[in-house]
């Protein structure tokens, strides 16, 4: 059985909150390894990658999002993040909504997905500012059955699963994203 949580002796930093004032959680996210993220995505019946505005500032995040799309993961791009994806030939299933609107759709039990084939069971988030994503993850945690996975460089306590806080080692963060993709 594969160990999920990040142990202190590993190359990954331990899970520490990026925003220490963000403490209103009854259960914190499990900090997970890249291979575990890949396995969760592979097991998902309806995965969705939601991309945020940080893609406009980080070309590598755009490249990773494109690779997720090439692996068959549909992308709901927030309005700003859709431009670099479309320029690379990616057709997001949604490209005009804000993260707030996407979150409202995902919470709606009658939502049939952006493609009309049913709601998503696993949603992965990439390219968001930590304080904005935190609020949306809290909402999804309390008002939906969706498995949420935060793969930004910030540990997100409101997600069900999250990368650990990687703000001090950008190259480790990129290598973790690549490891997820390599294992899909």
From Swiss-Prot:
What SUPFAM superfamilies does the record point to?
Answer: DHS-like NAD/FAD-binding domain
- Job description of the protein: Part of a complex that catalyzes the reversible cleavage of acetyl-CoA, allowing autotrophic growth from CO(2). The alpha-epsilon subcomponent functions as a carbon monoxide dehydrogenase. The precise role of the epsilon subunit is unclear; it may have a stabilizing role within the alpha(2)epsilon(2) component and/or be involved in electron transfer to FAD during a potential FAD-mediated CO oxidation.
State the similarity comment.
Belongs to the CdhB family.
Q: Which residues form a coiled coil?
A: none
What InterPro entries does UniProt report for this protein, alphabetically? CdhB, DHS-like_NAD/FAD-binding_dom
Q: From which source organism is this entry?
A: Archaeoglobus fulgidus (strain ATCC 49558 / DSM 4304 / JCM 9628 / NBRC 100126 / VC-16)
What is this protein called in UniProt? Acetyl-CoA decarbonylase/synthase complex subunit epsilon 1
Q: Name one GO biological process term.
A: methanogenesis, from acetate
Write down the superkingdom of origin: Archaea
Q: How does it assemble?
A: Heterotetramer of two alpha and two epsilon subunits. The ACDS complex is made up of alpha, epsilon, beta, gamma and delta subunits with a probable stoichiometry of (alpha(2)epsilon(2))(4)-beta(8)-(gamma(1)delta(1))(8).
Which Gene3D superfamilies would you find in this protein's record? TPP-binding domain
């Amino acid at each position: 059985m594969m160990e999920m949580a990040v142990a202190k002796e590993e190359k990954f930093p331990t899970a520490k909150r990026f925003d220490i004032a963000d403490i209103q959680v009854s259960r914190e996210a499990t900090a997970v390894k890249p291979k575990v993220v890949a396995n969760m995505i592979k097991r998902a019946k309806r995965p969705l990658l939601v991309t945020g505005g940080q893609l406009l500032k980080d070309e590598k995040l755009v490249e990773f999002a494109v690779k997720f799309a090439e692996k068959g993961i549909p992308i709901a791009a927030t309005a700003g993040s859709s431009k670099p994806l479309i320029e690379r030939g990616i057709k997001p299933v949604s490209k005009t909504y804000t993260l707030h609107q996407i979150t409202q759709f995902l919470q709606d039990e009658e939502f049939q997905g952006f493609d009309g084939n049913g709601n998503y069971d696993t949603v992965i988030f990439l390219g968001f500012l930590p304080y904005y994503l935190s609020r949306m993850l809290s909402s999804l945690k309390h008002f939906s059955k969706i498995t949420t996975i935060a793969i930004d460089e910030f540990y997100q306590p409101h997600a069900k699963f999250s990368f650990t806080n990687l703000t001090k080692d950008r190259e480790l963060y990129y290598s973790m994203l690549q490891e997820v993709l390599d294992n899909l």
